Amino acid sequence: MNIQEMILTLQKHWSNEGCVLLQSYDVEKGAGTMSPYTFLRSLGPEPWKVAYVEPSRRPADGRYGDNPNRLYQHHQFQVIIKPSPDNIQELYLDSLKALGIDPLEHDIRFVEDNWENPSLGCAGLGWEVWLDGMEITQFTYFQQVGGLECKPVSVEITYGIERLASYIQDKENVFDLEWTNGYTIKDLFKMAEYEHSVYTFETSDVDMLFELFATYEKEANRQMDQGLVHPAYDYVLKCSHTFNLLDAKGAISVTERTGYIARVRNLARKVAKTYYDEREKLGFPMLKEEEASHE
């Protein structure tokens, strides 16, 4: 099964479970959790079911396209369901069956791995899912997002697409993975991997990046003062990515690092609180729609 078929299979599976299928969000981010489809929609009482592929940029993991297991940009298949259903583990195992992985024939383990994202003020109870000794999925019950308690709790399932494909296709080098007939990851992404690594570690302008961080931070605050959550959050994401570029370049000291993470976290908390307050003013409309559908 190639990666394109894997994605289509997961989309069909989770669509059948009532998930909205959305496209990836168009601002740089380090993980699918950072998409507003997860970060914002996990807040408040309104029900939410979504599945989407998210390209995730990790500048420090760039290896010029030379490492068989490390990528500047990898892909995650993200599922968020709120409130978390009682049979979520069963639904997940069914998704593996749809991918041709029979849980009865493989060693599938849920290894406790509680999750935290300090820069976004997020935390949750979680497990890594191991398939025959290799991590393929992260399972998390959100307890806190943007510093706010999650009521009700959302469940997040994050499939590592390249990791899972390596197992399904039995390939040791990520660049040999077949995306679709006639196209490998090498064909599609190796040039970008090389160039982004050169930029990250060699040609990026550190002074400019520090200026951009300050500009993005200022604009995020300015938009929040106007009550504009989504534009503000876009600039929080830009702050986070710019910080990651600076961090990968070694431009931020250990003591400075803590301060920069706190600055991003403070922005994320403001956005989370503003979003919650704005939805509350609207009377949490999706909650009313859910109640009406059951009448």
UniProtKB/Swiss-Prot annotation:
Keywords attached to this Swiss-Prot or TrEMBL record, sorted alphabetically, are: Aminoacyl-tRNA synthetase, ATP-binding, Cytoplasm, Ligase, Nucleotide-binding, Protein biosynthesis
Q: What is its main location?
A: cytoplasm
In the UniProt record, does the keyword Secreted occur?
no
A Pfam family found in this protein is tRNA-synt_2e
Entry annotated with the keyword Lyase: no
Q: Which GO terms describe its biological process?
A: glycyl-tRNA aminoacylation
For this protein, the record's SUPFAM superfamilies field holds: Class II aaRS and biotin synthetases
Q: Which reaction does it catalyse?
A: tRNA(Gly) + glycine + ATP = glycyl-tRNA(Gly) + AMP + diphosphate
Query: EC number(s) of the enzyme?
Result: 6.1.1.14
Q: Name one GO cellular component term.
A: cytosol
What enzyme class is recorded for this protein?
ligase
Record-level Gene Ontology MF annotations: ATP binding; catalytic activity, acting on a protein; glycine-tRNA ligase activity; transferase activity
Intracellular or extracellular location(s): Cytoplasm
Return the similarity comment.
Belongs to the class-II aminoacyl-tRNA synthetase family.
PANTHER family per UniProt: GLYCINE--TRNA LIGASE, CHLOROPLASTIC_MITOCHONDRIAL 2, GLYCYL-TRNA SYNTHETASE
Subunit architecture: Tetramer of two alpha and two beta subunits.
* Stated name of the protein: Glycine--tRNA ligase alpha subunit
Q: Which organism is it from?
A: Bacillus licheniformis (strain ATCC 14580 / DSM 13 / JCM 2505 / CCUG 7422 / NBRC 12200 / NCIMB 9375 / NCTC 10341 / NRRL NRS-1264 / Gibson 46)
Organismal lineage: Bacteria, Bacillati, Bacillota, Bacilli, Bacillales
